[in-house]
Every structure is written in structure tokens, then in C-alpha cells.
Amino acid sequence: MKKILLLTAAVLISGSAMAQHEHFHVFRNDKQFNTFNNVQEITYQRSPSSGYNKMQVTDAKGNTTTIDIEAIDSVVVRSTGIPEFHVNLTDHPDWTELTGSKSDEHPAILRMDGNGMYDDLPEQEVTFRGRGNSTWNMKKKPYRFKMDKKTEVCGMKKAKSFALIANYIDCSLMRNTVALWLANYLEMPFANHCVPVKVYFNGICKGQYMLTEKTGVGSGSVDIDEEKGMLFEIDSNYDEDYKFAYDLYSHTAVQNGYNNTRTLPVMISDPDLTEIAPALGLTADEYFDTWKNDFSAMLTAVMTTPSTGSLKEYIDIESVVNFFMVNSLSSNHEMRHPKSFKLYKDSLDGVYKFGPVWDFDLSLIHISEPT
């Protein structure tokens, strides 16, 4: 737990634009404490074989203090300078955390203090809910909020919905940030951005979160025509309304026949077919069948075609290279499940593009210790 506190403190400081004003307090279990101003760097060194377990704090003048981890009782960081989100439920002001289903929507009042880094968000009514799959069952809950109109938040493109990622099993709080930075560096279309923020829920500080776009078809994320294109997800959670399994051996689609030994779990992630299909003069099931057949044809080509030239008729090769480069360099274990494997297509006449990349909780030599 002590290591987690220290890593969290280090990330809070590194994520701040006002590091020269940091006040970092280390309270020792012998009732003494150390106070550091102008903290520039925190390093953590541990050797299980030798029992070495130390933290080093370096200030702006280059002075370094070494602290025994076992002597630390608690750590407090003041004035991190990162944006602060304040969310107060109007239907359950006494709750200390969201309960029930992640899809339960609650009316709330949200405001954001940009702390001089970004424009503030004035108080406004939002819809607040949970998100995530396995992460929803963890102690530090991930959230999602939706505003009445598209709004720019922390420099991100205007959108109605945004996600607050808890990063509970990432004791560095940096895995998703590093991977998404790499995706943007490679200029992958529609790659998510992220901003470290502090979240208060009904007045209770929930710690540091990662603000990012809600992945989906829309101007703030996968910006394609929702009446022509489609966003797919291959994910073993297999929990969307429109889904099918692709048999890797017979090269056929099997409705609701997902089996992790021989099939791929394919789902329509966005848009909502029940809303889009009627505008096209189709039922949702008819429109789903059209895209299911198209996606299956692409998978069959990938599984059976030896020629890269022929595959260009089905997939965008550059997007494939960048997708696997990000996941390989980050050593993302989610690919093995598979989970969060997203692909999109502008229209039925186009080609499939891999991305946007998502979910790097189990990456970069992961250590699943909570934050």
C-alpha cells in the first residue's frame, strides 16, 4: 500500500503544470514528518532479494532525500494543479459511491475547476452513471457523464459524453496515458486523449482519474457518418445487443455461438441499430445481417488469403501495423482474451481500419496493485 501511495504522489506531481509550487508531506510512523517544497522528481527503488525499499525525493535545487518506505505512515500532496471535477447526485446526495448496475443513470450537478490549466466548466445538469466491465466491480469505480449539449472539456473535441477512468489496478496511473500518447504520436485516427483530473463524488474525494473521450461513433471520437459506417468490437465480454461469433475453423458466422476455443466474439459497438436502421428503410435485424456478412467476409479473407495485396481490398494495412505496434510495444495482455479490440469502417464500400486502441490496464509489465 505504501508503494501505491508513493507512486500516486509521483504521478500527481508529474501530471501537474505547477510543479514549482508543490508541497509534498511525508508523515512517518514515528510521529515525525518531512515536508518538501518545489519537488521535481520522485523515484522508487525496491529489491526484494536484498530487502532494499527506498524512496528518493529531489527538489528544484537538486537536493535529494532518501526515505525508508517502512517508516512511512501516509503521504499528502497539496496543490497538484490538475483539474478538479465535482459531481453531486441530485437523487442520492447521501451516497458515498455509485451502487447497482453500471447502466443506472442518475441526475447530477457537475462543475469543473480547471485550476488555470483549462477553462472551467460552470455548474450544469448532467446524467451520471458507471462504466467498464470487470473494473466496475472494483473498489474505485469508473464513471461516465453526459451533458445536454456538445461541450469542449479540457481541450478535447466537443462532445456530450466523456469517461472518467479509475485506473484502479494500475499503481502507476500511467499505462493508458502512455499507450494513448503513442497512438496519437503515430497519428492513428480517432485516438483517445487523456487528462489527469481529481474527482469529488458527493463531496468525497475519490482520487485521481483519467478524463478521456467516450469511444463511439460521433464527432468527439470515431468521426464517421453513423448512417453509413460502423464500429465493431471483438471482446470476450460479449455483452452488446447485436453480436455474433465467427468460427475460425469453418469461417462462418454463428449467431450467439461464442466459444472461446474456436470462435471470435464480434459485436456492434456503435451506432444503435434500432435508431439508424429505420432511417434506411430497414429493420435493425436486417441491417445487422448486412454488416455481419460484410465483417465475416473480411475475417474469411484474413484467415484464408496469403497475399497482402489481396487483403488491401478488405483492411487498411497501415492501421493494422499501427494497431499492433501500440499493443506490442505496451505488451498489452488484453489482446489474448480478446478484449477491447475495435475496428471501424466508413461505409460498406470502404475497408476496415483497426482502432481506436483502448484499454491498457494489463500492459507494460502490469502489477495489479490498487491505487
Regions found by a protein language model. Name each.
Residues 15-19:
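Sec/Tat signal peptide C-region and signal peptidase I cleavage site
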Residues 36-47, 68-77:
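Structured surface patches comprising rigid loops and adjacent beta-strands/short helices at the edges
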Residues 77-368:
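Phosphate/dinucleotide-binding and metal-coordinating scaffold of catalytic cores
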Residues 4-13:
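Sec-dependent N-terminal signal peptides
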Residues 20-25:
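Cleaved targeting-peptide boundary
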Residues 31-33, 64, 116, 205:
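Short, solvent-exposed loop/turn motifs
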